Regions:
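Conserved catalytic cores and adjacent C-terminal regulatory segments
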Residues: 2-457
């Protein structure tokens, strides 16, 4: 069996990396950091492709020598925005954690044990914080099962019931200019979740790198809350309850959040992270590709194992020309909001699938609903916290797991996989466990996480 030379360990391969690095570098520079000057965009130099690496089976007598020279894969979790539809993502997380326990033989296994980076937007950001926040720097506070239950139990505190009556939120905004605010209820729910005694947990109180976006009205640009940045300086460390409130501060449902870092040096006026990036998968991938301090041996997307959780399209709506040609502004508001959100998430999915190219099926899994046969969802399914809507979403979440997985094809739209979402999650859990086990055999560490300084009381 061939082994990697030192140069191969450090340099990306030309097969997938030049395309993927360029795509993600441009996306990161232009959209995450607002760079418009092409001179500031980082484009990698073309390099020679290394020899292909043989697949190593766990039972192979030569497995250990081969495994110890492998770079390993960085495991990434991404969770979309989606309001109350986030219950679907929570159901997928709960199933994944159950599969991890089964395949690892560890009844205490948690999602955070097996992922190296997590990104979440809006409700996905809340779930990310829940899964990776810790009070003892050892164990996550919440289980995966508790994510969707938290949303089901606290939905009325986050999304006011009155905002979804009489025609929906956008109609009320257009007609009255306001829907009221659920800020107080949301703030209380977030504080209860992310405190340790009298101390508010911050971004530093997470077990692994997390990325949670919001949109900063003061700079009119996306702002990304990052554990890595928080560990560098207190000027980028924020209380987790405020981060969660900021990323889920949907205009019209709750007021904007005036964010201030723990040292008071950084401020932003934050609203819903879903406005900045409804699908944060690209943010997570670019973070890994550009973070050589914590991920020193990553060459490109073939060194990543990515799970992206979305909610899919539950409203099967199509529009005919004769129907829309006479629409006025108020008629376009809600369809445009839905098209923008769904289109953005799908565009990211297509971009990621394009970057992974041939290793798409082995390195990237996207889980989301493909419609529902359980009855028609209401037009405000994403903001309706009523028991009936929660019950419906719980059932759709279970249905989603049994549905055939939907894959994005490069320049080919989407296709229905032969495997169900449940089977995809089972396979992915197996890959996570295998990667976790192999790391103890490798010469060099796959990851080298920054560690927070000891807390001073």
């Amino acid at each position: 069996m061939s082994s990697n030379t030192p140069s191969e360990m450090q340099e990306p391969s030309i097969d997938t990396d030049k395309l993927s690095y360029e795509i993600f570098s441009i996306l990161e520079s232009k959209f995450l950091f607002g760079y418009d000057d092409n001179q500031k965009l980082w484009i990698p130099k073309p390099i020679s492709p290394p020899a292909s690496e043989p697949m190593v089976q766990p039972g192979d007598e030569n497995s250990f020598p081969a495994i110890k020279n492998q770079r390993g894969k960085i495991c990434i979790l991404s969770i979309d925005s989606g309001g109350m539809k986030g219950i679907l993502c929570g159901k997928a997380l709960a199933y994944l954690e159950k599969a991890l326990k089964s395949k690892s033989g560890n009844p205490n296994a948690r999602v955070a044990d097996y992922f190296d980076v997590a990104a979440g937007s809006s409700v996905g950001g809340i779930f990310t914080a829940m899964l990776f926040a810790t009070r003892d720097n050892n164990q996550p506070i919440f289980t995966a099962e508790e994510t969707w239950r938290f949303l089901a139990d606290n939905g009325k505190r986050i999304y006011r019931s009155g905002a979804v009556k009489n025609g929906g939120i956008l109609k009320k905004i257009l007609k009255n200019g306001s829907t009221g605010s659920s800020s107080n209820g949301m703030e209380k729910a977030m504080k209860e979740a992310f405190t340790a005694g009298r101390r508010s947990l911050t971004l530093k109180d997470t077990l692994k790198p997390v990325l949670i976006p919001c949109y900063d009205l003061s700079s009119t640009a996306p702002f990304l809350f990052s554990r890595a940045d928080a560990l560098e300086t207190d000027s980028f460390d924020f209380p987790l309850w405020e981060v969660c409130r900021a990323t889920s501060a949907e205009p019209g449902l709750s007021g904007p959040v005036l964010m201030q870092s723990v040292d008071g040096q950084t401020k932003c006026v934050a609203v819903d992270g879903g406005l900045a990036m409804s699908n944060p998968t690209v943010a997570a991938i670019t973070h890994v590709l550009h973070n050589k301090q914590e991920f020193p041996f990553v060459r490109g997307v073939e060194d990543l194992l990515v799970l992206s959780l979305g909610t899919g399209q539950l409203l099967e709506v199509s529009y005919e020309y004769e129907q829309v040609k006479t629409w006025r502004l108020k008629d376009w508001a809600k369809p445009m909001a839905r098209i923008s959100g769904d289109g953005s998430a799908d565009s990211v999915d297509q971009t990621v699938a394009m970057a992974f190219q041939q290793c798409r099926s082995s390195n990237y899994v996207r889980i989301q609903a493909n419609g529902s046969g359980l009855g028609r969802c209401g037009p405000n399914v994403d903001t309706d916290p009523s028991p009936s809507n929660v019950k419906l979403l719980m059932e759709i979440g279970e249905e989603m797991l049994k549905q055939k997985n939907v894959e994005s094809i490069l320049f080919g739209g989407k296709r229905i996989s032969e495997e169900s979402n449940m089977e995809k999650l089972d396979w992915f859990a197996g890959e996570l466990v295998l990667e976790h086990q192999r790391r103890s055999c490798r010469i060099a560490p796959t990851v080298a996480f920054k560690q927070p300084s000891p807390k001073i009381n």
